[in-house]
Every structure is written in structure tokens, then in C-alpha cells.
Curated annotation (Swiss-Prot):
GO cellular component terms attached to this protein's record: chloroplast stroma; chloroplast thylakoid membrane; cytosol; plasma membrane
Main location: plastid
GO BP: intracellular protein transmembrane transport; protein import; protein targeting
Catalytic reaction(s) noted: ATP + H2O + cellular proteinSide 1 = ADP + phosphate + cellular proteinSide 2
InterPro entries: Helicase_ATP-bd, P-loop_NTPase, SecA, SecA_CS, SecA_DEAD, SecA_motor_DEAD, SecA_preprotein_X-link_dom, SecA_SF2_C
Protein name per Swiss-Prot or TrEMBL: Protein translocase subunit SecA
Binding site for ATP: Q79, G97, E98, G99, K100, T101, D487
Record keyword Transmembrane present: no
Coiled coil spans: none
Organism per entry: Gracilaria tenuistipitata var. liui (Red alga)
NCBIfam families listed in its UniProt record: PRK12904.1, secA
Membrane topology: Peripheral membrane protein
EC annotation from Swiss-Prot or TrEMBL: 7.4.2.8
Length: 882
């Protein structure tokens, strides 16, 4: 029934695809110049009230032809279906190697015709650069501008890239640019335009895996270094389960009564929780650093710095830091310099960032297991796109061992067998530590392998490792890094192998240290290289300062792409590349045939992840584009997933099993428990993300209001109206307090406050106001406000023309930013403490909304009052000559 429903859903696109092919028969006869003109014609149609869906067949036919002319690739029908699904604002689930990059360009072209811009979002800089280069190649045929955003760009460069028709960017840089734009002091510092349409590559990774991690821009904040060092010292003496308890599920630590008493004695204080000199947060962070955040698993140490490792991708997150003092506690634990703590200046979650878009869509190979969440939070439907060729991968049953030791032994034995028959094998591990453990075992068995994990020396070899992972006799150990954005080609990737051989050749010729080697350079390739004698001094590479590996790689790319080389030696180098490429194509083809006979790529999983999606991503490395392949998970009853979430059934099973440790367990109960454990974890984290979204929605509405006000001020060239508006609101608030007050002295004090605020010099007793009603007093004070402000404006204009406008904008932006930063701190404290309300039979979310609203109103009042006071009362010392 379900398959019938799915098939019908896809069948509705058949008429559109037929129409695309029909129009394509005409488009293929266009000259390059005629093809280029079609974009302008389609844009005119949109201006004349055509909607995008009406011109979809025509636009897709044009892109299809541009792709064919620029790359030689022909779009399959399933890719066109994927593009239609993206245009409709849905998620296209497409398997590895099915051409997601091309699918995004096709949809991007159609939606870019509105001239409002399209963002194509990737998970890392490498993919953004790679995909943008392909898009530029294609879009040069259809007169469309493609931009790329990188972290190192200037304001002007970013603005130009955002103003392009299609812009490639990473999810983190998009978020940080949004936050920076909303902290800009000048309007010309804003780089982004409106959020029109986004296509997210690896959409599940960004919208689900990273949903719990907010993007934060922070500023330095003074810290007490001695407290961190002392807390680390104390944490090392405390005993687990005696002095403190750990909840591994929630990653929380609680001190026991005995632990609290011990800490207070060691610190010689009466109260760990003393509001004026609190130690509790320092101690809890030190305990988390000791037991929950482990080196080579959650972070690595490089150049005396703690660098976070992303638990989902296995990649290092350079420049990111844990908040609330946790990062400093880990620095103290590792005995490296403790850096300043940070105060949050601006933040946003990915959930709310992507909900800013008018239309959102995404692509991934694994989203079906999370379709409920994607639908409920983002209103995105997941549609499975069939593969162009039937997937022939064989997913073998899990092998479960009693102990972790026996599991690793079995994996090593399997690798030994695969190596000796020549079958390429990829082993996926959950962290750096486990990948290095397996590496040591294989070294003892004298099995050659490639290791890919977050450590810098291995990351630098990523291209080389992935290039060869599908070759015969290749064993590759990898963390989750190999699970995203990479295609493992059986027999090897001839283009990448040729570039590596050429890089190695140039490094040798330039006398540079070769920090990596191909597993082996074939004899025929070495012969080709040795037959080419280059005069190195004639090469343009000598123009580069401090030649290194990156510059050599960039230089080779430039020569390969450039059809008209400058020098004869560079022409030789180009010919050498083509000769190597031709040879590697033969080698890789022969190897592919041999690997296919052996059963294709074999993927081994060493532990079930918290999410079935991550497991499916690893499996998806095998069986690319209809190739054969296989996957199998080797597990143990001591694995984290089973230990933390498995429940009592697993424990009982462990006690009752009396079989040999060497024998893998196959049990229906165990398989069900395994699936149940994974579903429990997924459900648990979904609830956390759902709750986070509900709470974050409150602050998001406040953020939108503050940022809208800030933008209004930035865009305004006449901020006087804004100051007057703020001052009038402040007068209204004070007048309301005046009428509520019964005490005469208090009333008199309130009137004095108004006079001070408005910088009025005349003493005015409130008795004279008795005969006036609220409206009359209000109008009188409004009039006094304008008179007072006119005088101040006139005075400052005489000192320096335009000074008052600059002052107004400065005070407005400064006070909004300062108040918002303080408000974020208060909201964080409220969020941490609001859970206790449930003990008083109150709904924490309802209470949070009420209190957050009160805090927001108080913040708005504070902004109005301080801006009014600063503008009306501040004394300026001005150097008129400067």
C-alpha cells in the first residue's frame, strides 16, 4: 500500500518530465549565444506575471542543455524529479552518487530567475568551493552569476557574492553573517539581502544533528583562572558514585551530600552555592571535563589549544568553543593556557535561522527516519527519489560479541581476510580514539591501511585517502568524516589519482618534504613521469612566495583548467597530466572489474550510532550508482548505545548468555533490543530538540522585533523622529506612574524625574498641574520635549554640522546592543531555572513565556529611557578642530 502511494506521488511528475524533454529537442539546436539569451527571456516572463511553476519545464530544459554542453553529463529523469521536489519546497532523499550537486543547480537556476537570490548551503568549505566551481562552469552558458562565501572574505567581497543569482555558503558562515549583519554599526556593513530560497545539502545533518547547537557570537569576559585550576585539582580527588553521580543519558553531574561536604572542607568555605562567591559551576564543569568530555573523542589538543570534534561528522570545529566555562575547565584539565570566558553578544539556532526563508528545501541520502520531525518543525515533506540504477548493496546481519575486546579482534580478523583477497574495505569508527585503537591492531597484524580522522596530519590526506578507498587491497579506517559529501569510486578516481601523482612529482622536483605518498605509484605511471624532463625554472610556480603543498595543488588545478598556458614548460606539464590521466583511466577500469568480482566495497561499522541515519550514511558508501557492495556492523554488549539506552533486557541477556566469547551472538531478542535502543535514543533527542524549539521560539520572536528595530535605525538618515518617539513613550510611562501614585512627595519626585530627563531648567511644582487632565499634561510635556531637543540640536549643529545625527544613531545602536546582550544573559538564567516550576504544579513553558515577556518589556523600557537620557543629558567634550 505504501509503495503504491509513493509510486503515485512520483508518477505525477511524469507529464512535466515529458514536457522538459519535448522543449529540450528545440533547445539543443540553439547556438551558445541563443542559449545565453534564454535567461533574459524567462526573467521577462516572470515580470509579466508568469509564476515559476509555469516556466519550470522550459527553464529545466535550458539548464539540462547547459549541463550537457559544459560538462558532457546528461541529466537522468530521476534527477529532474529531484529538482522538481526541491522547487516545491520539499526534501529530496537521494542516495550517494545520484548527482545531488547537479539537481541543486537545476532548481537554483529556476528560482534565481526572480532576481531575489538563491542560497545553496553545504556542510563544509570544501564542498561549497567544489560545487560552486561546477555551478560557475554551467551558469556561464546561461548568463547567471554564481558566488561563493568564505570566512576570510571582506565585507565588500561577501556583499558581491550574496548579490549573485546563486550563492554557495556553509551553514555556519550563513548564520554568523546574519548575526554580524544585526550587529553592524553602518548600513553599508550589511552583506546579506533577503532570505528568499535555500537549498540545504545534507539537510538532515544541519536541521537535525546541529539543531541543538546554537550559533553564538561572543566577546571577552574576565575570568578567575585560579578557580578553574583549584576546581580541576579537587575534581581529580573526588570519587564517582561516592562524591558525585553521572547521568550519561543527559550528560549531567550531581554532587552528593558527601561530595558537597568534601569540597567545602577542601576550599575552606561554608557554602559552595554562595551567590557572592559561587564555586559550584566551576566544580561541575571540572567533573564534566574529567568524566564526560574525553581527549581524542570529544576534542583534540593542537598547538596548546582545545579543538572540538563534531560528534556527527568527525571533523574538527576550528574556532568553536564550549560555553558557560566548560571550555576553560577542559583547558585546565589538559594543563594548557586558560583563555578568557566569553559573554554572548548575539545568538541564533539553526532551527530559527532557516525558518527565516520564504521557501526552504533540502537534499540528503538519509532523511526518511526523521521525516516526522522535519515535517512538524520545518514543514518539510520528505520524498524518496528512486535511484537511476537499482541498489545492489547487501546489508548483512549484525554480529554481536559479548565483550568489546572480542569485537575488535573479530574486526581485525575480517580486515586481515579482506586485505589478503584484495577487497577494498572501509571501517567506520565513532571517534578518533577508536580509529587509532584499530590502527594499532592492524599495525601488529602488518596490514597496510589508511587512517582518516580529525587529527590534522590525517585531515591533510583526506583527498588522497578517499581517492584510493575503492582500490584493490585498500583498507581505510575512518571516523564519520567519510560519511558526507564524498564518493568512493571502485578501482579509484583517475582524475584525483593523476593530480596526486603530479603533485608528488612537483614536490620532489622542488626539493620539498613529501608529507604523504600514494600507496604505490604504478610502474607505468613512474615511467611516464620519468620520460618528461621539465625545466623547473621556467614554471610560473616560482612566482609564489613560500611554496607549499596547498600552493602546488592550486597551481596544478590552474594548469589543468587553463587551455592556453603561458609557457612551453606549463604546456608540457599539462600534457604530462593528460598522459598520466589516460593511463590511470585504464588502470582504474581494470581494477574496478577485479573489485566487482570480489563483491565491491565492503563497509564495516564498529558501533551503532545514536541515530539510524548515521548508520545508513556509512552503509551508503557502498553500492554507489548500481555497483555491488556489502555492509556489516560488528557490535558488543559493552557498546555505549546498548549500555546506556539498552535497558534491563540487555543486562539480563548478558548474565544469561553462557556461550563462548569468540562466538558472535545472533538473537531475535537482541536485534529487537538493538532497534528499540536506537529508537529510544532518537525519540529522546527529538524530544530535546522539540523542547528547545518551543523555548527558542519565545526568544526568536523577541530577536525579530529587536533586529527589525535596529534595521529601521540603520536605514534611517533622520533618526531625530526615533529619539522623539522613544522620549514620548518614556514620558507616557512616567505619567502613568504619576497618576497611579497617591503620595504627594512621590508625585513631586516623579515630576522632577521628568524635568531631569527632558533637561528642563525651570522648577515646576506639581500643584500647578492639578487643573490639567492627563492629555493636557502629556501635550505640555511633549511640547517641552521638542523645545528642549531643538535647542540641543541647534547647539550641536553649531559645534559640528551633522554631529547630532551621528550621536543619535550611536546612542540608539549602542543601547539596543547592550540591552539585548544583558537580556540574553537573563534569558539564559531564566531557561536554566524555569524547570523547577513544575514542582509547583506549573507548566514551565507557560511560565517561561510569561516571565520572558516581562523581561522583554523591561528591556524595551530601559532602551527608551537610557537613549532619551543620554541624548538629552550627556555632556560632550568636543575638539572642534578635529
Amino acid at each position: 500500500m505504501f509503495n503504491f502511494f509513493k509510486k503515485n506521488k512520483l508518477n505525477k511528475f511524469q507529464n512535466t518530465i515529458n514536457e522538459i524533454h519535448q522543449i529540450g529537442n528545440t533547445v539543443k539546436n540553439y547556438s551558445d549565444a541563443e542559449l545565453k539569451k534564454q535567461t533574459h527571456k524567462l526573467k521577462k516572463k516572470i515580470i509579466q506575471n508568469s509564476n515559476l511553476t509555469e516556466i519550470l519545464p522550459e527553464s529545466f530544459a535550458i539548464v539540462k542543455e547547459a549541463i550537457k554542453r559544459s560538462t558532457g553529463m546528461i541529466l537522468f529523469d530521476v534527477q529532474l524529479v529531484g529538482s522538481i521536489v526541491l522547487h516545491q519546497g520539499q526534501i529530496a532523499e537521494m542516495k550517494t552518487g545520484e548527482g545531488k550537486t547537479i539537481v541543486a543547480i537545476t532548481t537554483g537556476y529556476l528560482n534565481a530567475l526572480t532576481s531575489k537570490g538563491v542560497h545553496i548551503i553545504t556542510v563544509n568549505d570544501y564542498l561549497a568551493k567544489r560545487d560552486s566551481e561546477l555551478a560557475q562552469k554551467i551558469c556561464s552558458y546561461i548568463d547567471l552569476k554564481v558566488g561563493l562565501i568564505t570566512q576570510s572574505m571582506t565585507y565588500e567581497e561577501k556583499k558581491r557574492a550574496y548579490d549573485c543569482d546563486i550563492t554557495y555558503i556553509t551553514n555556519s558562515e550563513l548564520g554568523f553573517d546574519y548575526l554580524r549583519d544585526n550587529m553592524a554599526i553602518e548600513f553599508n556593513q550589511i552583506v546579506q539581502r533577503g532570505f528568499n530560497f535555500a537549498i540545504i545539502d545534507e539537510v538532515d545533518s544541519i536541521l537535525i544533528d546541529e539543531a541543538r547547537t546554537p550559533l553564538i557570537i561572543s566577546g571577552p569576559f574576565e575570568i578567575e583562572i585560579n578557580k578553574y585550576k583549584k576546581s580541576t585539582s579537587i575534581a581529580n580527588t573526588l570519587q564517582k558514585d561516592l562524591d558525585y553521580e553521572i547521568d550519561e543519558k543527559t550528560k549531567n553531574i550531581t554532587l552528593t551530600e558527601k561530595g558537597i561536604s568534601r569540597c567545602e572542607n577542601m576550599l575552606n568555605i561554608d557554602n559552595l552555592y554562595d551567590i557572592h562567591d559561587s564555586w559550584i559551576q566551576y566544580l561541575l564543569n571540572s567533573l564534566k571535563a574529567k568524566d564526560l568530555f574525553l581527549k581524542n573523542q570529544h576534542y583534540i589538543v593542537k598547538n596548546n589549544e582545545i579543538i572540538i570534534v563534531d560528534e556527527f561528522t568527525g571533523r574538527v570545529m576550528q574556532g568553536r568553543r564550549w560555553s558557560d566555562g566548560l571550555h576553560q575547565a577542559i583547558e585546565s584539565k589538559e594543563n594548557i593556557p586558560i583563555q578568557q570566558e566569553n559573554k554572548t553578544l548575539a545568538s541564533i539556532t539553526y532551527q530559527n535561522l532557516f525558518l527565516l526563508y520564504e521557501k526552504l528545501s533540502g537534499m540528503t541520502g538519509t532523511a526518511k527516519t526523521e521525516e516526522t520531525e522535519l515535517d512538524k518543525i520545518y514543514n518539510l515533506e520528505v520524498l524518496e527519489i528512486p535511484t537511476n540504477k537499482i541498489c545492489k548493496r547487501q546489508d548483512l546481519p549484525d554480529l554481536v560479541y559479548k565483550t568489546e575486546y572480542k569485537k575488535w579482534q573479530a574486526i581485525a580478523d575480517e580486515c586481515f581476510d579482506m586485505y589478503h583477497i584484495g577487497r577494498p574495505t572501509l571501517i567506520g569508527t565513532t571517534n578518533v580514539e577508536k580509529s587509532e585503537l584499530l590502527a594499532k591492531i592492524l599495525m601488529e597484524l602488518q596490514i597496510p591501511f589508511n587512517l582518516l580522522n580529525a587529527k590534522p596530519e590525517n585531515v591533510s590526506r583526506e583527498a588522497e585517502i578517499i581517492t584510493q578507498a575503492g582500490r584493490k587491497n585498500t583498507i581505510t579506517i575512518s571516523t564519520n568524516m567519510a560519511g558526507r559529501g564524498t564518493d568512493i569510486i571502485l578501482g579509484g578516481n583517475p582524475e584525483a589519482l593523476s593530480k596526486l601523482a603530479l603533485t608528488y612529482y612537483l614536490q620532489n622536483k622542488l626539493g620539498l618534504k613529501v608529507n604523504y605518498l600514494l600507496n604505490n605509484i604504478e610502474t607505468q605511471i613512474t615511467t611516464i613521469i620519468n620520460n618528461y624532463v621539465l625545466d623547473m625554472q621556467e614554471l610560473d610556480i616560482y612566482k609564489y612566495k613560500n611554496i607549499d603543498l596547498k600552493k602546488i595543488q592550486y597551481y596544478i588545478e590552474k594548469i589543468i583548467k587553463n587551455e592556453h598556458t603561458k609557457y612551453s614548460e606549463e604546456e608540457k606539464l599539462q600534457k604530462l597530466y593528460l598522459k598520466i590521466l589516460s593511463e590511470y583511466k585504464n588502470i582504474c577500469y581494470q581494477e574496478k572489474q577485479e573489485v566487482l568480482k570480489l563483491g565491491g566495497l565492503y563497509v564495516i561499522g564498529t558501533e551503532r550510532h545514536e541515530s539510524r541515519r548515521i548508520d545508513n550514511q556509512l552503509r551508503g558508501r557502498a553500492g554507489r550508482q548500481g555497483d555491488i557492495g556489502a555492509s556489516r556492523f560488528f557490535l558488543s554488549l559493552e557498546d555505549n548505545l546498548l549500555r546506556i539506552f539498552g535497558g534491563d533486557k540487555i543486562s539480563q541477556l548478558m548474565d544469561n548468555l553462557n556461550i563462548d566469547e569468540h562466538t558472535p551472538i545472533e538473537s531475535i531478542i537482541l536485534s529487537k533490543s538493538l532497534d528499540s535502543a536506537q529508537k529510544k535514543v532518537e525519540s529522546y533527542f527529538y524530544d530535546i530538540r522539540k523542547q528547545l524549539f518551543e523555548y527558542d521560539e519565545v526568544i526568536n520572536n523577541q530577536r525579530q522585533a529587536i533586529y527589525a528595530e535596529r534595521k529601521r535605525i540603520l536605514q534611517s538618515s533622520f533618526t531625530r523622529d526615533c529619539i522623539i518617539e522613544y522620549a514620548e513613550s518614556t514620558i507616557d510611562e512616567i505619567l502613568t506612574a504619576f497618576y497611579r501614585e497617591d503620595n504627594i512627595n512621590n508625585k513631586n519626585h516623579i515630576i522632577k524625574k521628568i524635568y531631569q530627563l527632558l533637561n528642563l531648567t525651570e522648577n515646576f511644582h506639581f500643584n500647578t498641574l492639578y487643573d490639567m487632565n492627563y492629555k493636557q499634561i502629556q501635550e505640555f510635556l511633549y511640547e517641552q520635549l521638542r523645545i528642549s531637543y531643538d535647542l540641543r540640536e541647534s547647539y550641536l549643529e553649531q559645534l559640528r554640522p551633522g554631529l547630532i545625527r551621528k550621536l543619535e544613531k550611536y546612542y540608539l545602536l549602542q543601547q539596543i546592543d547592550k540591552a539585548w546582550q544583558d537580556h540574553l544573559d537573563k534569558m539564559a538564567l531564566l531557561r536554566e531555572s524555569i524547570g523547577w516550576r513544575s514542582y509547583g504544579q506549573q507548566d514551565p513553558l507557560v511560565e517561561y513565556k510569561n516571565e520572558a515577556f516581562s523581561l522583554f518589556i523591561n528591556m524595551v523600557r530601559y532602551i527608551r529611557q537610557t537613549v532619551t537620557y543620554l541624548t538629552m543629558r550627556s555632556r560632550l567634550i568636543i575638539n572642534v578642530n578635529n
